């Protein structure tokens, strides 16, 4: 998504990070008296994408800073994207204000990939990443063994790429 925002929408300053990275950066900036630079770094972006927002629960100072950052960007019409294991309203410790801001957009539960979609993604990623063609029969054997989300499929494509480069076949 971050790459698409950069390419299609010509957004140069797209910030994509985990909630843990945001928290660590915030804590570090407070300790080093760099809160102004922190705020500038996060509030002057074209788009903000934060993964694993469930990590934010019960971190009061970080939640407050995240809320102010979200409000600043939302009022400027900047795209915001949050991902997490739960809906914002279900994250323990997340303030109602921030959960409400997150839920004011589109909240979409992500289901595990079905076998056909997983196969299509695997084929595409292997075609994009691997120097050599991978036989369809091998993909037929691998695909049913995969479970979970796109990260698992990406890992398999990376493994095939690495093995091809190591062994040249």
Regions found by a protein language model. Name each.
Residues 90-92, 105-117:
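Conserved AAA+ ATPase "SRH/arginine-finger" region at the nucleotide-binding site
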Residues 123-127, 137-145, 151-166:
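C-terminal helical "lid" of AAA+/P-loop NTPase domains
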Residues 68-69, 73-96:
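Sensor-1/coupling segment of RecA-like P-loop NTPase cores
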Residues 1-15:
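Walker A/P-loop
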Residues 7-8, 25-50, 56-72, 125-128:
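Conserved alpha-helical scaffold flanking the Walker A/P-loop in AAA+ ATPase domains
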Residues 27-31, 88-104:
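Short regulatory helix/loop adjacent to the ATP-binding pocket of P-loop NTPases
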Residues 16-17, 49-51, 79-86, 109:
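Structural recognition of the conserved hydrophobic beta-strand(s) that form the central parallel beta-sheet
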Residues 86, 105, 117-132, 159-163:
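Conserved AAA+ ATPase "sensor/coupling" helix adjacent to the nucleotide-binding pocket
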């Amino acid at each position: 998504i971050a790459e698409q925002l950069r390419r299609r929408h010509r957004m140069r300053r797209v910030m994509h990070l985990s909630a843990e990275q945001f928290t660590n950066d915030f804590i570090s900036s407070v300790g080093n008296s760099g809160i102004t630079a922190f705020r500038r770094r996060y509030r002057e972006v074209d788009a903000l994408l934060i993964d694993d927002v469930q990590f934010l629960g019960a971190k009061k100072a970080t939640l407050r800073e995240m809320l102010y950052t979200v409000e600043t960007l939302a009022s400027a019409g900047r795209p915001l994207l949050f991902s997490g294991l739960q809906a914002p309203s279900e994250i323990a410790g997340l303030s109602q204000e921030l959960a409400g801001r997150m839920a004011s957009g589109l909240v979409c539960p992500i289901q595990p990939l079905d076998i056909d979609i997983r196969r299509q993604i695997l084929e595409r990623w292997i075609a994009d990443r691997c120097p050599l063609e991978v036989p369809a029969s091998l993909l037929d054997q691998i695909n049913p063994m995969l479970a979970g989300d796109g990260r698992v499929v990406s890992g398999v494509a990376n493994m095939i790429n690495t093995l091809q480069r190591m062994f040249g076949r």
